[in-house]
A protein has these predicted regions:
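Acidic/polar hotspots within intrinsically disordered regions
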Residues: 7-10
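The feature marks the mature, well-folded catalytic cores of soluble enzymes
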Residues: 2-3, 13-319
Length: 319
């Protein structure tokens, strides 16, 4: 177990919080903070899970066509983005804050990589790729206008991508990956001190949410690959909380948006049957959900997914 030193000055981290590698350099999972929720706290967290009021998105720049080895169909990417924003407005009832496309930010549509918002705190991340760091410009002002407490990762040794952050409602899992290092995970634990925070090793070019997401207050949607199964096993070892799991054949299809609309309606935005027909069949088992298919074939070519295309927040204020 890895914990914050009680006497660390300036919110620093003791030697126990540095590392994350086992023998032979193999990545290991660690607990950065362990907390136990009481029944009342857990019930409140479940009630708030999937509750959103706003979404922050960015338009598709023409320069996106040069990404993904030039395989991106720009016109289709723009259509898919329009449908996606329509789903956020019409199916989830969100106020959508649209940032204009910026030709200097070819991957700028992936706003969900740039920040995570939990409770009253927004954490602006620090992408490991220097060329993407300008994508965070303007977010601090936006979050301040929404009356959030705003934190920003400024440590130059930290790398943090919000697509590696999975908030379950009661705890936080952070993928330590090509895109997020242990120092970045420590910044998450430092920012959200009311929640247990654990790290999950992720290999290759994947993010943690490349193969998992929340499908309800106590439900994890998980892919079927070895990477997904290993991550799920580590989560089960690290958590004190019980989660139901819904396993889908295709890892990318495990990345969904779960939202609660109104007092009782559960909505799941998932990848379309055109893209992943076998996984779409699995979602049909969720008979008490409103299922909303959404394609993101083009944004997936630049490493994106459904959750990466918006910053979802819960704030009952007008911008």
């Amino acid at each position: 177990m890895v914990g914050r030193g009680a006497d660390d000055a300036d919110g620093g981290w003791g030697a126990a919080g540095v590392g994350g590698r086992g023998k032979g350099g193999a990545a290991v999972s660690v607990t950065l903070r362990s907390l136990r929720f009481g029944d009342k706290d857990a019930s409140r967290a479940r009630e708030m899970a999937g509750r959103y009021t706003h979404a922050v998105v960015r338009g598709v720049p023409s320069s996106m066509a040069q990404e993904g080895d030039g395989q991106v169909d720009l016109a289709r990417a723009q259509r898919e983005s329009g449908v996606y924003c329509g789903i956020l407005r019409q199916k989830l009832g969100l106020q959508v804050v649209e940032l204009p496309p910026n030709e200097e930010l070819p991957r700028g549509q992936l706003t969900g990589d740039m920040a995570v918002v939990i409770a009253d705190t927004a954490l602006i991340t620090r992408p490991s790729v220097p060329a993407r760091r300008k994508e965070t410009d303007g977010l601090q002002k936006l979050f301040e206008e929404l009356k959030f407490r705003v934190c920003e990762v400024t440590d130059e040794s930290a790398a943090l991508d919000a697509s590696d952050i999975l908030f379950t409602g009661t705890e936080i899992f952070v993928g330590v990956s090509k895109w997020t290092n242990l120092r970045g995970a420590e910044m998450v634990a430092k920012t959200y001190q009311d929640y247990a925070v654990s790290t999950i090793p992720v290999s290759g070019d994947l993010h943690l949410k490349s193969f998992c997401s929340m499908g309800g207050p106590d439900t994890l949607i998980i892919g079927s690959s070895d990477a997904a199964r290993k991550a799920l096993k580590m989560m089960e070892q690290l958590t004190d909380h019980h989660y139901e799991t819904l396993t889908v054949p295709d890892d990318p299809a495990a990345n969904c948006i779960y939202a609660r609309v109104g007092p009782k309606s559960n909505v799941l935005v998932h990848r379309s049957a055109e893209e992943f027909p076998d996984s779409a069949q699995v979602f049909q088992k969720l008979t008490d959900y409103t299922l909303v298919p959404a394609s993101c074939t083009e944004v997936s070519k630049i490493g994106g997914c459904l959750t990466a295309c918006a910053i979802l927040i819960n704030r009952k204020l007008d911008i």
